[in-house]
């Protein structure tokens, strides 16, 4: 699991980015959030880092 902070999340477009504690930015889509989880800018989160077609992606995101 990787930890990080939500950089931004657009609820209308259902995506955003998380800056990992490793300094890398991860794309997150609403489908990558664990059920019942909502995130907003500044939230501390943990997630599984994966490699998507366009780069790093966060899956199974949950708040800490």
Q: Where do the model's predicted regions map?
A:
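Beta-strand/loop nucleic-acid-binding surfaces
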Residues: 24-37
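Structural detector for short beta-strands of small beta-barrel domains
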Residues: 1-10
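Short aromatic-glycine-enriched beta-strand elements
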Residues: 13-18
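Short nucleic-acid-contacting surface segments enriched for D/E, G, S/T with interspersed K/R
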Residues: 34-46
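OB-fold/S1-family single-stranded nucleic acid-binding modules
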Residues: 50-64
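A generic beta-sheet turn/junction motif
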Residues: 10, 21, 51-53
């Amino acid at each position: 699991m990787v930890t990080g902070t939500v950089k931004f999340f657009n609820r209308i477009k259902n995506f955003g980015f998380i800056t990992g504690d490793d300094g890398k930015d991860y794309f997150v889509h609403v489908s990558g959030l664990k059920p019942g989880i909502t995130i907003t800018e500044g939230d501390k989160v943990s997630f599984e880092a994966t490699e998507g077609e366009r780069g790093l992606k966060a899956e199974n995101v949950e708040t800490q």
